[in-house]
Amino acid sequence: MTTILKHLPVGQRIGIAFSGGLDTSAALLWMRQKGAVPYAYTANLGQPDEEDYDAIPRRAMEYGAENARLIDCRKQLVAEGIAAIQCGAFHNTTGGLTYFNTTPLGRAVTGTMLVAAMKEDGVNIWGDGSTYKGNDIERFYRYGLLTNAELQIYKPWLDTDFIDELGGRHEMSEFMIACGFDYKMSVEKAYSTDSNMLGATHEAKDLEYLNSSVKIVNPIMGVKFWDESVKIPAEEVTVRFEQGHPVALNGKTFSDDVEMLLEANRIGGRHGLGMSDQIENRIIEAKSRGIYEAPGMALLHIAYERLLTGIHNEDTIEQYHAHGRQLGRLLYQGRWFDSQALMLRDSLQRWVASQITGEVTLELRRGNDYSILNTVSENLTYKPERLTMEKGDSVFSPDDRIGQLTMRNLDITDTREKLFGYAKTGLLSSSATSGVPQVENLENKGQ
């Protein structure tokens, strides 16, 4: 069976991921007019820039949908977001600022839940608005087929007939008007935005040029912290985790994770926390650039990693970072539910997150400027009395340390001999009396 359909399957049911925007509206209307039977599915991901979700299915029906459904994906999305924090599943960082993989997380949820809803309705052909140059076309492809092995893919934006007739936004707008719908194009921004309640992505157009900075972006989850005219008073906030799960903010306990994240977004957003500018590698190995917002994810991540460093030993923390980066890349590639990702998730949640219990107090200022004011946990292995510089009882004595240092003579001797060996073969230039490379010796030999 052909998985990807290049032309419209006339007379068949097609499920379209319907956002209500110009692209999917024109595509739905065009498919109906050409003889297909479109079904519209809208994911409620808690997008901060969406005002009326209930109106979206109604518009789909007006444009010719056989049926239109609104699928509430918020609970699942937040669950996956918390799992990503527990695992440190983030691999794109620049200068210490993290991209929290909010779009890949949204695609994992959308791609599985919408296709599951389509399957319930007997719809086995899926279309969405992803383009052939981006990551989403592959993410949706993988998640869709994981959910429904019989699924076929039809994307109007890969159909030459559709492109020839409605290849641009102007043509789409004119098409809608000609069909009796007073659809006006929204005001063109200098970039495009995609969002869910975990975060927002701003990319393309002017942001493709690296001399266009974050300053051209109007945040939808935060504030312009770079604008000195924007008043942002400092604010103290406490975050509490129990067994790796965020449960309370500023002393208020949440039984609903969705409400917890919304509050975290409000707190972090007041300061512009979690905004970052990243150059990343797309799945196809080409580089792209995005500016990201994720105020709630950033707030939870900071508190989580503070507890992590105070609770776990060095080797565990090293494995958390290494496996987290590996898992983040799998998530980015649309492999969040693949076996290799599930293996990493299970180990990180079981052996790392389960011990993260405690409370962190932060002072948030402007943007990603913050201070950690206090860290409290019954599981802390940080114990200041062990290494206090004050006089008193100690868990080890000066003689104990002398013995420990003496044992280091073995590997120090080995290292010294290797340095001399490197010098003899010309790999290093060293002094006559030691094997240690020195700047002046390198300069003298022009190496």
UniProtKB/Swiss-Prot annotation:
Entry coiled-coil feature ranges: none
Substrates-to-products reaction catalysed: L-citrulline + L-aspartate + ATP = 2-(N(omega)-L-arginino)succinate + AMP + diphosphate + H(+)
Keyword Cytoplasm (UniProt): yes
Binding site residues for L-aspartate: 131, 135-136
Positions contributing to ATP binding: 17-25, 43, 129, 131, 136, 194
Protein's UniProt keywords contain RNA-binding: no
InterPro entries associated with the record: Arg_succ_synth_type2_subfam, Arginosuc_syn_C, Arginosuc_syn_N, Arginosuc_synth, Arginosuc_synth_CS, Arginosuc_synth_type_1_subfam, AS_cat/multimer_dom_body, AS_multimer_C_tail
GO CC, any one term: cytoplasm
E.C. designation(s): 6.3.4.5
Positions of L-citrulline binding: 99, 135, 139, 192, 201, 203, 280
Record GO biological process: argininosuccinate metabolic process; L-arginine biosynthetic process; urea cycle
Subcellular location, record wording: Cytoplasm
Keywords, in A-Z order: Amino-acid biosynthesis, Arginine biosynthesis, ATP-binding, Cytoplasm, Ligase, Nucleotide-binding
Classification via HAMAP family: Arg_succ_synth_type2
Protein family per UniProt: Belongs to the argininosuccinate synthase family. Type 2 subfamily.
Assembly description: Homotetramer.
Descriptive protein name: Argininosuccinate synthase
